[in-house]
Amino acid sequence: MRKLFLDAFGEKKLDKPPVWIMRQAGRYLPEYRAVRAKFDNFMDMCRNADACCEVALHPLQRYDLDAAIVFSDILTIPEAMGMDLKFIKGTGPVFSEPIQSQKDLDKLKSIEDSIGSLDYVYNAVKTTSSTINVPLIGFTGSPWTLAAYMIEGSGSKQFNKLRKMMYANPQLMHSLLQRLADITIIYLLEQVKAGASCVMIFDTWGGILPLEHYKNFSLKYMEYIAKNVKQKINIPIVFFTKGGSNFFEEIKDKSCDGVGVDWSVTLKQARHRIGVGKVLQGNFDPAFLYGSKQSIRETVRANIEFIQSDKLNNYIVNLGHGIYPDIDPDSVRVMIDAIREFSA
């Protein structure tokens, strides 16, 4: 197995940084769209281990990447808890009966029953990890982010229902978050048992919170998960809070080994605020791939020059969030080729 990605979490400064791309197995690739067309709905595809493996392999077959990520979705846990999940074109994920009260929370399945409904994810991890020659990243949504969808019923611009519950009924909110955290610990450990070499916690909506509420309603539960996972097995864990650059000083002392960085700050700024010891992952603006070949190469060169100037810390080159569906696959090749060229 190529171990450059895992070596980034070691103490030795690497000669060159590893690279992978968030949502690297996705709609921007025509081969992904061909597989997706075979299934009536998205979750049916996620439940098919062979299909998950096939689409996880697509970017590895196209590009020189140092890691793969299991093909799945962050909302597998809420669905396993008994919530009715549908993916609606033009809207995205929708829960038909959002959590609004203690009664709704009481309807959810137990942790044991919920975990038993997630075997298809572990099968996808096992099938994929046994096929590839690079590390496989497992993942989950943060409890706060999962709760956002479970309470709102779908994505939202303002998340009024979510934030209302946080302020008006914090006890109920914490009850939901704790249950999600307890399930997530087992979920991640099972992914590791199945073959994941690293796990990532995607805190997509943590960035909407004020600092104190981020600490109490989001980071607290990510840290709880990380500590409990590491008590069982010492595996690299990456925290990524989208829009979370204001929280770096809080994250830097937590149990994660890596921190995802979006494009709202430079890597230099992020390193200054996080300090030494943690791997930084990111932080290209996904939209930079709309640019010309020359502009892509210039942006890559600037980041690689900074990474190489830091003699103490390692970095994982990535986008600051998932790749957009309408990105030209050839632009991705330009980016990766430039990363390899300027890192040589």
Curated annotation (Swiss-Prot):
Lineage, uppermost ranks: Bacteria, Pseudomonadati, Pseudomonadota, Gammaproteobacteria, Thiotrichales
HAMAP family noted in UniProt: URO_D
Protein name from the UniProt record: Uroporphyrinogen decarboxylase
A GO term for molecular function: uroporphyrinogen decarboxylase activity
Pathway involvement of the protein, from the record: Porphyrin-containing compound metabolism; protoporphyrin-IX biosynthesis; coproporphyrinogen-III from 5-aminolevulinate: step 4/4
Swiss-Prot/TrEMBL keywords: Cytoplasm, Decarboxylase, Lyase, Porphyrin biosynthesis
Residues where substrate binds: 23-27, 73, 149, 204, 321
Cited Pfam families: URO-D
E.C. designation(s): 4.1.1.37
Subcellular location, principal: cytoplasm
Task performed by this protein: Catalyzes the decarboxylation of four acetate groups of uroporphyrinogen-III to yield coproporphyrinogen-III.
Superkingdom field: Bacteria
Compartments where located: Cytoplasm
GO biological process: protoporphyrinogen IX biosynthetic process
InterPro entries assigned to the protein according to its UniProt record, in alphabetical order: UROD/MetE-like_sf, Uroporphyrinogen_deCO2ase_HemE, Uroporphyrinogen_deCOase
The family this protein is said to belong to: Belongs to the uroporphyrinogen decarboxylase family.
Family annotation (Gene3D superfamilies): 3.20.20.210
Enzyme class: lyase
Subunit note: Homodimer.
Reactions that this protein is recorded to catalyse: uroporphyrinogen III + 4 H(+) = coproporphyrinogen III + 4 CO2
Cellular component aspect of the GO annotation: cytosol
Sites annotated Transition state stabilizer: 73
